[in-house]
Amino acid sequence: MENQLWHNTVRCCNQYQESPHDAEDILLLLLGLIVLVNIGINVATMMWHGLQNALDKMIDWATQKNEIQASESPPSGPPDKAQDVHIHCILDPVQVKMSRPTQYSSFSCHHFSNHHSSSLLRCVRRRRRRHRRCRRRCCNHQQRPQNYRQIPHSHSVFRNPHRSQKMSQLHRVPFFDQEDPDSYLEEEDNLPFPYPKYPRRGWGGFYQRAGLPSNVGLWGHQGGILASLPPPSLYLSPELRCMPKRVEARSELRLQSYGRHGSQSRLWGNVEAEQWASSPPPPHRLPPNPSWVPVGHSPYPSVGWMLYDSWDQRRRGTEGFERPPASVSRNARPEAQGCREHHSPQSHQQSLLGHAYGQSHRSPHPSTEPLGYSSQDPREVRRRAADWAEALPAWRPLTTSASLTVLDEASHQRTPAPSSVLVPHSSQPWPKVQAADPAPPPTMFVPLSRNPGGNANYQVYDSLELKRQVQKSRARSSSLPPASTSTLRPSLHRSQTEKLN
């Protein structure tokens, strides 16, 4: 019994002792569970952050890779290719109509500057060919007894201004006129005097209408090498031509000096002057019998001109000659001066020098040298003078037969009776010549002192200086009585100091 009670007590004690152990175990378990949960949360948090970082990195890498692939790889759609633009240009050939320009009474700046150096060379070559043709023509036409001129009166360079204006209005045709190219040529056929269909451009802006074949094929109608280009005059507008320019010309062209007050200023090349001087004059200007020409008289009549050539004067200056005085052929006939100055050696030498200079340009006959005819019969002299007057041409723009008229009263008073025997008297009345005031010597055109390149044969002409001298010569010519126009050798300057009443 006692043992049973013992056992029950021990059990109760054991039960009391086991119960706190269970509470501690439960607490430990709870603490363990809390720790485990905390660790699990932390691990889960760490894993989440790690996974989140990994996901972010993967997303960033994927986006960068896509951007790189998008930039490197071509777009998925077909690319727009650049289209080639093909431009076909068709250049039509330019049709050129050569129209005659307005003829000016004197040169201005743009007349001289119209020509380039290349056109000067072409003009020289054309004049050489024209010179050969003119020689043949003059040789063939010397036997022709009729009035024949190499340059007809209606084609003269120094023509009436009203007539030149009318002709310029008839023949002024625009270059780019799209009408019939031969429409203005039909008007030329109706004119009373012939013109070449395609005029040739000459020196100084004039058309030499001498019936020579033209070279328009170089520019237009005949399909020359420059048919597709406009003529050079299109580039020279009036504004450009009036601007000051430097015009260079070689001295082989031998530019002419300016003439006297009454002359119209012209510039001509002495290349053409040599052609005119070498070719014989027209036959109708010759006297019936040159062997009986009076003393000191040229077969060509005179009205008191003094013709100068600047190049020839420079050459004479180098040879020691003096310029022929202007009084040799002014205010009196050459034969009367030859009679008056026969006993004066110096004046006789000057008159012979002026006479030889005029003969070298105007007379190829050596038989016109001074001869003595004081022993001839006056009736024979009068009869031959009448023949002389009949042989002279009827058309006299300057009344050039005035050298055969009666001398002035002063000439009769100065010369004795033997010289009056030589005076021919015609049945018809002759016009009386009134001498004008003596004019000063011609103003020489002095080029500038510049000499580019050191070449002695190369001069520079200033267009402003040229224009100034042209205006000065115009002012002088306007102050003097009007001089009648005529056709002369274009290489020589004309100066008329006598006026016909």
From Swiss-Prot:
UniProt signal peptide: none
Family matches, as Pfam families: Spem1
Membrane topology recorded in Swiss-Prot or TrEMBL: Single-pass membrane protein
Origin: domain of life: Eukaryota
InterPro entries linked: SPEM1_N
TM regions (residue ranges): 26-46
Compartments, record wording: Membrane
One GO term describing the cellular component: membrane
Alphabetical UniProt keywords: Membrane, Transmembrane, Transmembrane helix
Region Disordered, annotated ranges: 316-384, 409-501
Bias (Low complexity): 476-490
Coiled-coil regions, chain positions: none
Name under which the protein is recorded: Uncharacterized protein SPEM2
Gene: SPEM2
